[in-house]
């Protein structure tokens, strides 16, 4: 089995490096040549185009930022689908929404190509091989992806048919967003009540309310947190809002958090421009 990986950004780089470290010798491609040049001496094959990755690899992991970037790699000039062979498996790691992967699976099936819906969660855990990979799709293509997934995943969880993994990831990220908003509120309340912030961070980070947003807030504050996290969380909450869903408190709180983060981002930028 030959493997390929496209999408050497913040999330994809440690995933590809785990594949290299495990001896899979993946075919790699990046839009910027300087990114690909970092792997000149690595145990990997460097492709000139996405089409070359498709011509050489049986299983290809795609970790692009969004649907537009994924489409560009698949269908653009010298894209994957210009050279993909029947039986090729595409593992879609980007968070792009259920409709996108369902449409993609139907579209590439006419070429004999398979899609595995496989968004990831965990961020920095990729470098340690401890990502959560949420998978959906047919068993045989999933099985072919397993050796690749095992290099960067601590857990691989199957949740159903194509689109179910995207839906699960969107629920996960909506919950993260909502929790983040409540963490902001908790610290704002603590300030109003005169509680020392480091002490409150220790309480919230050590007790029953502990969650990943608390230590991040404690380290960088709400404004910097918003600067860093807003683009991705905004994208994912917008995907949730595009679904035909009943009204839920989860989505309402997530939406309110995105609006609050946008205000905090603007305030932060304004404060920096006047100093």
Where does each model-flagged region fall?
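NAD(P)+-binding Rossmann beta1-loop-alpha1 motif at the extreme N-terminus of oxidoreductases
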Residues: 1-62
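Hydrophobic residues within alpha-helices
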Residues: 15-19, 104, 148, 189
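Anion (oxyanion) recognition and catalysis
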Residues: 20, 40, 109, 150, ...
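Hydrophobic beta-strand scaffold residues
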Residues: 26, 46, 114-116, 156, ...
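Rossmann-like NAD(P)(H) cofactor-binding subdomain of soluble oxidoreductases
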Residues: 50-55, 59-131
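Rossmann-fold dinucleotide-binding core
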Residues: 95-173
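Helical "substrate-binding/catalytic lid" subdomain
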Residues: 164-275
